């Protein structure tokens, strides 16, 4: 990677470190998502504690945190590998934000935004997988994990030159969901709708 690409990746990390969930909840007078609900500063938890409009604002901002640096990097002439590292930097910022004591979200929306510029085919299949699993199961976490496992295959099919960096991002997402995977295995994960289970 060039020195410019490394600096740009760090800038993407700083942008990703802006926790929209915390900021939106503060502006809207809602509880801190890091201390309420699932304790995850992400759109799904904000939906639980603050409603759909607050969650939508968080989701859009988180998507843009990943999409903007990758789009700009593309027009700045970064290589495919460097663009992948920029996407990874944005996701790392969301998950481990330097501005919020490294307590961040799961990175799903930011990863979606970072991967979407690769192409319409990748974006459509990625979104379609998440929606299908979510509609069938009601589990946001399960939708994210299955999507993360399948997205590298979609990328390999449509844009194989991006497969390795996208796989790194998806591995990070699966790792970040390890607690959710354990709760799903034990039948203790909460659905977005329907009867909620106790996570203790």
Curated annotation (Swiss-Prot):
GO annotation (BP), single: phospholipid biosynthetic process
Gene Ontology molecular function terms on file: acyl-phosphate glycerol-3-phosphate acyltransferase activity
Pfam families according to UniProt: G3P_acyltransf
UniProt-listed SMART domains: G3P_acyltransf
Subcellular location as annotated: Cell inner membrane
Chief location: membrane
Protein name: Glycerol-3-phosphate acyltransferase
Organism whose genome encodes this protein: Actinobacillus succinogenes (strain ATCC 55618 / DSM 22257 / CCUG 43843 / 130Z)
Phylogenetic classification of the source organism: Bacteria, Pseudomonadati, Pseudomonadota, Gammaproteobacteria, Pasteurellales
Gene it is expressed from: plsY
């Amino acid at each position: 990677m060039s020195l410019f690409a490394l600096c740009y990746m760090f800038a993407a990390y700083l942008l990703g470190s802006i926790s929209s969930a915390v900021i939106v909840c503060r502006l809207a007078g809602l509880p801190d998502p890091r201390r309420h609900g699932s304790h995850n500063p992400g759109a799904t938890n904000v939906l639980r504690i603050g409603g759909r409009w607050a969650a939508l604002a968080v989701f859009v901002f988180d998507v843009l945190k990943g999409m903007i640096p990758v789009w700009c990097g593309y027009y700045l002439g970064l290589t495919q590998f460097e663009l992948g590292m920029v996407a990874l930097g944005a996701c790392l910022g969301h998950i481990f934000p330097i501005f919020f004591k490294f307590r961040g979200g799961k990175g799903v929306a930011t990863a979606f935004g970072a991967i979407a510029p690769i192409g319409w085919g990748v974006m459509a299949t990625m979104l379609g997988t998440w929606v299908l699993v979510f509609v069938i199961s009601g589990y946001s976490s399960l939708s994210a994990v299955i999507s993360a496992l399948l997205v590298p295959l979609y990328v390999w099919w449509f844009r194989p030159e991006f497969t390795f960096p996208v796989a790194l991002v998806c591995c990070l997402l699966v790792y970040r969901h390890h607690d959710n995977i354990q709760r799903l295995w034990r039948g203790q994960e909460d659905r977005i709708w329907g009867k909620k289970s106790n996570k203790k």
